[in-house]
Amino acid sequence: METKVHLFCQAEENIDLLDDGSNSFATDLSSGTINHKKYIKFSKTIEKEISPEIRSLSPEYKKIFETSIIFCGEEKSSDFSGEKKVGRKSLQVQQHSKRTEIIPPFLKLSKEKVTRKENSLCKLPNQYSVHKTSSPLCTSSAITREKEMLSNLYMTLYDEVTHGYLHSKELSALHKACKIFSKIRSGKIYVNDLPVILCILRISISDLEMRQALKTVDIDAFQDALKIFCRIKGGRVSTDDVFAVLDSMGIPINREILEEVTKHTYIDSNHMVDIGDIIFTLNELQEQYEDVSITEGSPLNEITSDRKLSSVAGCYLKYKKKNSLSSKLPEPSISKKLNKKSNQYYSKIMENDDLESKRPKNTWQIRKFLGGVGSSNVGVQEPYSKNGINFKKHSEKGEIHDSKSKPQSLKSSTSLSKSLDKSDISSIPKLQKPAVRKHSSLQKQVSSTEKTAISTLENFCEAISKLQENYIAAEELQSILPSTGINLLDEEFQKIVTDTSRNENGMVELDDFVNALAKERSFPECNALPGVIKAIDKIKDKNVDYEDLNTCLQNFGIYLSKPEFKKITELTEAGETKKVNFKEFIDTMMSNTECFSEKLVLPDAIETLDDLRKETMSVSDLWNTLSSLNSNLKKDEFLAALELVTVDEGDKVQFEEFAKVVRNMRDAARLEELQEVVLAADLLEGDMIAGKNLEDFLRNVGIKSPKEEVEKILQSDFVSEDNMVNIKDCMRALRDTQKFSNYIDFRKEASNLKLPKVNEIKEAANILSHVDNGKIGIPDLEHALKCLNVNLTEEDFNEALNCCNVSDNMEVDLKDFLMKMKESPHFQKSKATQILLATTQILQNDLVDVSDLKTLLMDKDLHTANAILTVMLRHVPEHESGKVSIQEFMTKLSDILTIPKAAGKFYLICTYCPDLERQAVVYMLKTIQDSIVKAQVSKKQYNMNIKQHKISLHNFCLNSKANIAKLNPNSKF
């Protein structure tokens, strides 16, 4: 860091001669006065430049501190109406400081605002007044003193604080809209103004939040803002959308008032209006209504309202075009009759509506500070005229407009030109004194928002009064910081205080504290929107390179899946230069991406995770959440679990407690199933079972209605005289029933059938659905059947073709071919082939319409396939209109076709049987015809083995797939 020190001395003498009869600002007496003033100025200038290494991080950053000590010797003689002369000598010593900063562009705006706020709060009672003088030197000196500010180090507490955030939550919707559209002109906004506007919109975005958009960003607020600004093009809105835009901003207005406002607003040939004109006109109108209702003797009728509205609209539009406060008062747009009243209203608006006569002297500066608008003409105090009225006017809105229409470097001079000088005052001597509010006229009740604002203002004034010294106690400083809008954690405050110098009494030096605070807080704010800045850099002349398009979206916090991005890029035209119009791309994305539609809601997964993080949940919300997760928790199981948990008075339960109960219930159910299998094995006596125990045996192995099955079995001829039943014969009889035979045949073909992949099914569906007048080429037909793994023999295929009319183009009617193929033995036996072929005929957009599929199967008299389909899709969640994705469909079909393979070892096979509603059919012991495993083991050995391995066994029994539980690989059979 480089430091340069410059010392210089300057001396000047001013002679100020006031003739008899001239008006003095201190008295109305005529006098002759000769003033002799001698100035000796010692100045020290310190210039600090940051080293090149640091400069790379903070470019163009330089501070210049100038401290001046002025010794002023004054000799004054006066002659009052010929009486004796009075002479007076005085010596004044004053200290001035001037600080110049060359700062990076991204900090320039906040620095200028803070400097203006500091200047407006730093006026001291003994500062110089500017007098007319005959000496050119004095004029030059006055200008120099205008640019300087008195040393007031304690006010630099607010240097690094973004004061635009203060009280943003306490603004009404209309005032928020005014602040937003004061920053936005022609649809554009300065990057430096983005944090303030996003704060008002309650959109919190940082670099970390950009990376974790779906987890932390306030998407609702972003979408609300998006809905508002998507209708605004170049700062203009269609007249038909004005009401909707205002309503979405939360600005209450009836259509009659809006129509009246629109009448006095410029409408272009496209029936578009400037939304800023509408909002500012409404704000002016509202303030005038409040003035009229509070000021005594000012009734308001419809005629006055209409005239006043015209006056407001005309006044605002004229004021907007000039972009600065004119020295002349605006003329009325309706009639001369309202001239006086319009001038009074306008003057009151310019003087800050809630200024009262008994406010502290610095209230005006504080209100400007809170509003985020300041003035740079600190060194000038306008004199008061005879009637005591201060004609110094400032317009917050004028400065806001001006800051947007001119470069940032000109803001200081622009703000200075907005204050009326003495020549301006002399040009309007007949201006009437504006109406001043009287405390006795404040009859209406103050709203809670106003009370909060007043309380906050009082706290702020109290904090300012305490910051009048260069040193302050650390505890007191920490207590008043929140009143100034600086919220620090205890750790942050202690860290800053530790790095701050103190005096012998242990009090903190404010200037040092402010510098430490600036270092602590400035850099994170500079990195508030790095992603947005990167995205803006990629946009050149409204176009983005095609390869940078997805990265640009991600910098804005928009993450699209690959299919979504591909779909949108296909709908967007790229020029010869491989560039895409970014606005057109966004419009295409908004209209063609489901997640950005007007019905935007958070993804179900995000909502579910958010709900599950809550400590307590209502019973209804818990059931809906678990249902959306497809948790396979049945309603009776859910109700049973509720009986075991604590439900409070608000019908809420602890989620962790509920989850623990459900886990215990599931473990108990699995153990119970295992115990039932063990009990079934205990009922066996070798390979025989007593008839009286047959019902319990079937119930334990999972048959839902064992009584009916037992009655059928006991009537069979394989029951012995002592009412004993051979378990092999019992199982064979059970398999011969219709519902068992259909299921077992279906499972048998699974061992020889290779299921097609999802992409193959889509390909087959695409071939079979795109036919010309019902005709399909034979090569395409063969390819579609091959994709479905339909193992038709060549003889069956040719036989089906021979029964159909084949054209010269080798095309065949698809319906005729399918009818003939239905008669083939392979198709009749293969239920899986029936389901797959029917699925391809109704598959659309990767969705299977379950109702249409069942109807098609029934129309083709494929009742068994329809029954299997019903069981297969029993627990599959359906989308809208009763549709299921093809991925879920094939997963369930694969699950139901899975069958274990034999490995030459003893296995207990638990096969999931859909026809018997979730229960397991257990094939065990001795030889079973056509079974996978042939095993012969004694009852004692079986019981010992199954008990030994029950822990590993119960983890498999209730799965939807057919699973294998290994018992003893070394058993001898």
Swiss-Prot record:
Record protein name field: EF-hand calcium-binding domain-containing protein 13
Segments of skewed composition (Basic and acidic residues): 396-405
Keywords linked to the UniProt accession: Calcium, Repeat
Compositionally biased region (Low complexity): 406-418
Domain EF-hand, residue spans: 488-523, 524-559, 633-668, 756-791, 792-827, 864-899
InterPro entries: EF-hand-dom_pair
Name of the coding gene: EFCAB13
Annotated stretches, region: Disordered: 384-448
UniProt xrefs under PANTHER family: EF-HAND CALCIUM-BINDING DOMAIN-CONTAINING PROTEIN 13
